[in-house]
Amino acid sequence: TDCPVGGALFDGFSKGVLGLIPCAAQLVETDQGLVLIDTGYGVQDVKRPHPRLSKFFRVMLNIRFRMRETALRQIEALGYSARDVRHIVLTHLDFDHAGGIEDFPDARVHVMEKEREAAERKRRGFIARRRYRPAQWDDVRDWRTYANGGEPWFGFDSVRDLDGLPPEILMVPLPGHTWGHAGVAIESEGRWVLNAGDA
């Protein structure tokens, strides 16, 4: 959980000096296994925040690291294991959305192609060097990246299916917060929900 000084300026509702910004992950059950939308901070981030995360963001966001809040521990509390998570769909590769990737080593990781390219660029600016933390995802063995393009959907121009996932889970490009930022649309019981990441 991020608790930045600034309260309501950051989260829109806090009454005190500190804001409250949870690093949310979403778990979806499918016939192909569990699908995790973003991961939040991971076990290693909690154990060793330095050097995994930049001092700039650790201080600015006043991060409260709690092992019980990691996606892995919450999934285990539901009676599942890391191996049950077959897919991770990322809205983007910022440290607070991708930190738990390595907690699920057997999962296929889905992300927009432009996002992966931006995260791996050698000459990045001040913020990019601090937001993208390769140590969080450099051991991923199964990446699936997606170029812009696809089908129209509810006013969006280029929504697309994801390899190995049912058509009830879609990637929706939403560039802006990062070059390859995306939303993830999920259909459940005839209704669509859009996880807009940080858009």
Report residues per predicted region.
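Zn-dependent metallo-beta-lactamase
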Residues: T1-R64, D139, G149-G150
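Active-site beta-strand termini and strand-to-loop segments that position acidic
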Residues: V28-D31, G164-P167, I186-E189
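Active-site metal-binding loops of divalent metal-dependent hydrolases
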Residues: T39-G42, L93, E115, G176-T178, ...
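Metallo-beta-lactamase
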Residues: L61-Y80, D84, E113-P173
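Active-site-proximal beta-strand elements of phosphoester/diester hydrolases
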Residues: T1, L36-D38, I169-L174, L194-G197
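Active-site metal-binding motif and surrounding structural segment of the metallo-beta-lactamase
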Residues: H50-V111
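Structural motif
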Residues: G33-V35, H87, R191-N195
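Cap/insert and terminal regions of metallo-dependent hydrolase folds
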Residues: V43, R58-R73, G183-A199
